[in-house]
From Swiss-Prot:
Record's function text: One of two assembly initiator proteins, it binds directly to the 5'-end of the 23S rRNA, where it nucleates assembly of the 50S subunit. One of the proteins that surrounds the polypeptide exit tunnel on the outside of the subunit.
Organism in which the protein naturally occurs: Laribacter hongkongensis (strain HLHK9)
The protein, known as: Large ribosomal subunit protein uL24
UniProt family annotation: Belongs to the universal ribosomal protein uL24 family.
Gene giving rise to this polypeptide: rplX
Gene3D superfamilies: 2.30.30.30
Length: 106
């Protein structure tokens, strides 16, 4: 089970964007990376491509960051938190915050 999923609110805990909060737009599990909204934004100089209908210029692009550089945001404590996996009585696995044991996304 993935501890960070698409739609989770995360906090960057290390790197040039440390302290920024954003929503996970995409998870790349094979690469161990996530794309977070408003984090690791770079400027790309793009040539015009009339075949695809693309205009040229400087475009902002959001790149992925390593999943170890983000932590899920716990709304109860208003801090970054770790995530654990708990099995319920009916056999389902759910994600829980390590600090207070509450369900993630509940």
């Amino acid at each position: 089970m993935q501890k960070i999923r698409k739609g989770d609110e995360v906090v960057v805990i290390t790197g040039k964007d440390k302290g920024k909060r954003g929503t996970v737009l995409r998870v790349l599990p094979t690469e161990g990376r996530v794309v977070v909204e408003g984090v690791n934004v770079v400027k790309k100089h793009q040539k015009p491509n009339p075949v695809k209908g693309q205009a040229g210029g400087i475009v902002d692009k959001t790149l992925s960051i390593d999943v170890s550089n983000v932590a899920i945001f716990n709304p109860a404590t208003q801090k970054a938190d770790r995530v654990g996996v708990k099995t319920l009585e009916d056999g389902r696995k759910v994600r829980v915050f390590k600090s207070n044991g509450e369900l993630v996304g509940a």
